[in-house]
């Protein structure tokens, strides 16, 4: 990153660019070395120009959403990290249809805020997401969900800026959702950099607000009872295998709950949570991940794939 590009970032983004920013401050795991620059665009125009200049100068960039499904290595990230949480938190309700309502939601809005809005306004369809950390944009990008529902169930359209700076909109018929994956049918977003989700249209039904709040509270209670509290984590660390027992059960059957490497430990509450006891490094978590993968593979012949995105050096 040359001095001219640094000067442009400082001139345009001022206090919205942070140099050598520790990523441990921006991930739910609380680990990770510094990013060369963390930049928070406020508008689509700023985002497009930032992406265009990165591409023109061959500077790598990645998107930071809620940081809840992200493990950054200890030496950090070279290039630009685009913060899509700070200024992208709007909710716009359109004219209701007979069967429900349509919302346009900023990619940086937290799932928690969206779930509260839906319940408060008698809009059904988001209860499955209660307790899932992160932002709407990040949740769509990985098709976050549970056995009770997925983001793909409620998404009607996605607005994006492509890796070459184009602003595009894709309707439901153009979108493909699968387990922990989102893609575009007949993809024209394929460019040297990833598309950046800026907004999402959601289709929600109608229900009694008090009933929705009660269902949300029950969902919250169940998650609290079965998942670790008091430690930093990324949520479920491994994808569930396509067949057979889920990852957490395999880890439990292998006797790995409580296994620790440095400050990282397999949660006693849920085997698919690798948690930071307060002093973990990314290296600790990666070493623990590899140990769990090896022990599960040796015992059951199953290779666990990480659900978290692992980035950096």
UniProtKB/Swiss-Prot annotation:
It is an enzyme of class 1 (oxidoreductase). The active site is at 180, 236 (proton donor), 307. Pathway: Cell wall biogenesis; peptidoglycan biosynthesis. It holds the Pfam family FAD_binding_4. It is found in: Cytoplasm. It catalyses: UDP-N-acetyl-alpha-D-muramate + NADP(+) = UDP-N-acetyl-3-O-(1-carboxyvinyl)-alpha-D-glucosamine + NADPH + H(+). Residues 31-207 form the FAD-binding PCMH-type domain. Keywords: Cell cycle, Cell division, Cell shape, Cell wall biogenesis/degradation, Cytoplasm, FAD, Flavoprotein, NADP, Oxidoreductase, Peptidoglycan synthesis. The keyword Oxidoreductase applies. GO terms for biological process: cell division; cell wall organization; peptidoglycan biosynthetic process; regulation of cell shape. Its cofactor is FAD. InterPro entries: FAD-bd_PCMH, FAD-bd_PCMH-like_sf, FAD-bd_PCMH_sub1, FAD-bd_PCMH_sub2, MurB, MurB_C, MurB_C_sf, Oxid_FAD_bind_N. GO terms for molecular function: FAD binding; UDP-N-acetylmuramate dehydrogenase activity. It comes from the Bacteria. The keyword Flavoprotein applies. One of its GO terms (cellular component) is cytosol. Its EC number is 1.3.1.98. Cell wall formation. Belongs to the MurB family. This is UDP-N-acetylenolpyruvoylglucosamine reductase.
């Amino acid at each position: 990153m040359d001095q001219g590009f640094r000067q442009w970032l400082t001139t345009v983004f001022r206090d919205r660019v942070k140099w050598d920013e520790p990523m441990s401050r921006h991930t739910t795991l609380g680990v990770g070395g510094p990013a060369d620059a963390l930049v928070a665009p406020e508008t689509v125009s700023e985002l497009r120009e930032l992406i265009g200049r990165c591409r023109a100068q061959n500077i790598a960039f990645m998107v930071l959403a809620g940081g809840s499904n992200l493990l950054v290595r200890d030496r950090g990230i070279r290039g630009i990290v685009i913060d899509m949480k700070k200024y992208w938190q709007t909710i716009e309700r359109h004219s209701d249809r007979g069967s429900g309502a349509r919302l346009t939601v900023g990619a940086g809005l937290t799932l928690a805020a969206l779930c509260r809005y839906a319940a408060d306004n008698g809009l059904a369809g988001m209860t499955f997401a209660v307790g899932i950390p992160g932002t709407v944009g990040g949740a769509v990008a990985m098709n976050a969900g549970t056995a009770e529902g997925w983001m793909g169930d409620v998404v009607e359209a996605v607005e994006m800026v492509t890796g070459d700076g184009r602003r595009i909109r894709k309707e439901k018929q153009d979108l493909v959702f699968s387990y922990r994956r989102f893609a575009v049918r007949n993809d024209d977003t394929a460019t040297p950099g990833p598309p950046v989700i800026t907004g999402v249209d959601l289709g929600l039904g109608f229900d009694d607000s008090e009933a929705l709040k009660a269902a949300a509270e029950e969902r919250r209670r169940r998650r609290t009872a079965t998942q670790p509290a008091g430690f930093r984590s990324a949520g479920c660390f491994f994808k569930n295998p396509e067949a057979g027992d889920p990852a957490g059960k395999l880890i439990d059957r292998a006797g790995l709950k409580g296994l620790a490497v440095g400050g990282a430990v397999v949660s006693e509450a849920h085997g698919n949570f690798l948690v930071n006891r307060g002093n973990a490094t990314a290296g600790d978590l990666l070493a623990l991940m590899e140990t769990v993968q090896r022990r599960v593979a040796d015992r059951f012949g199953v290779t666990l794939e990480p659900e978290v995105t692992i980035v950096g050096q």
